[in-house]
């Protein structure tokens, strides 16, 4: 099954970032305050304005992004955990 995001939504695959302190203690996701990282899998066409114009999404498939811990909606597709996130919930693109 494939997902095609609508409007200004973006499908993101969360990257596994094991968080450790300098001494090697693993910090669980529930205690981490840093934003999560992910890779953009698919991008919607953009958000429609009141006059009917489409504002394209400023991301593309393959971009590495930062997003908040509670951003988006989690979905499982073919056993893979993905997030459907609005463009405005993405904090930054990692370059």
From Swiss-Prot:
Q: What is the lineage of its organism?
A: Bacteria, Pseudomonadati, Pseudomonadota, Betaproteobacteria, Burkholderiales
In its UniProt entry, what is this protein called?
Co-chaperonin GroES
**Gene Ontology terms for molecular function:** ATP binding; metal ion binding; protein folding chaperone; protein-folding chaperone binding; unfolded protein binding
Protein family per UniProt: Belongs to the GroES chaperonin family.
InterPro entries, sorted: Chaperonin_GroES (IPR020818), Chaperonin_GroES_sf (IPR037124), Chaprnonin_Cpn10_CS (IPR018369), GroES-like_sf (IPR011032)
SMART domains in alphabetical order: Cpn10
Gene coding for it:
groES
Task: Quote the subunit structure annotation.
Answer: Heptamer of 7 subunits arranged in a ring. Interacts with the chaperonin GroEL.
Query: Main subcellular localization, coarse class?
Result: cytoplasm
Native organism: Bordetella petrii (strain ATCC BAA-461 / DSM 12804 / CCUG 43448)
Protein localization = Cytoplasm
Alphabetized UniProt keyword annotations: Chaperone, Cytoplasm
